[in-house]
Design a protein with these regions (language model features):
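Residues within alpha-helical segments
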Residues: 72-73, 110, 131, 139
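Phosphate-handling active-site elements
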Residues: 77-88, 112-133
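Solvent-exposed beta-strand sheet faces enriched in polar/charged residues
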Residues: 15, 45, 55, 86-90, ...
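DPxDG-like acidic metal-binding loop motif
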Residues: 97-125, 139
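ATP-dependent small-molecule kinase catalytic core of the GHMP/sugar-kinase superfamily
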Residues: 2-7, 13-28, 119-176
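Short gly/ser-rich anion-binding loops that grip negatively charged ligand groups
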Residues: 54, 58-65, 96-103, 116
């Protein structure tokens, strides 16, 4: 099968209201996720064995901790798929910038491999699987801007008038 290349879009929170702290360490919130154009680019080459690889490695992130590999493994485990994949990442989004790069990469991986491996999970099933990887993953699975509550996993799709955004990322990282 020929390689599949997809963009993993970034997002911005047009507003963010923290409404409480949960016992599991997450915060309850209300936010408006706006998906943007651009983002990281991922190329998927399927293999006939169950091995997963990611190139290039991201400095400071062990491969087994990378959300791309974790998403692929989660899909294998959920579906019993015995195929594998070699994944190339062209990183365009800065890490720790609050743009959802890791979550978007995980969602893009789930969507791509669900298709390439013929897993046939629904969008709702992929969103549920993605929520186990990160609170922002479901909005990227849904693929459209949304009002979010809970930990960001209770989504109401919304149409937002097209706007232009200038995103400036300072030379520091924020753990989100």
């Amino acid at each position: 099968m020929s390689p599949l290349t997809l963009s993993a879009p970034p997002k911005v929170n047009l507003f963010l209201h923290i409404t409480g702290q949960r016992d599991d360490g997450y915060h309850n919130l209300q936010t408006l996720f706006q998906l943007l154009d651009g983002g990281d680019q991922l190329t998927f080459n399927t293999t006939n064995n169950a091995e997963l690889s990611l190139w290039p490695q991201i400095e400071g992130v062990a491969e087994q901790d990378n959300l791309i590999i974790r998403a692929a493994r989660a899909l294998q485990q959920q579906t019993g798929c015995t195929q594998g994949c070699s994944i190339e990442l062209h990183k365009r989004l800065p890490m720790g910038a609050g743009l959802g790069g890791g979550s978007s990469n995980a969602a893009t991986t789930l969507l791509a491999l669900n298709n390439l491996w013929d897993c046939n999970l629904s969008i709702a099933e992929l969103a549920k699987l993605g929520a186990c990887l990160g609170a922002d993953v479901p909005v990227f699975i849904e693929g459209r801007s949304a009002f979010a509550e809970g930990i960001g996993d209770q989504l109401t799709p919304i149409d937002i008038a097209e706007s232009w955004y200038l995103v400036i990322t300072p030379p520091c990282k924020v753990s989100t």
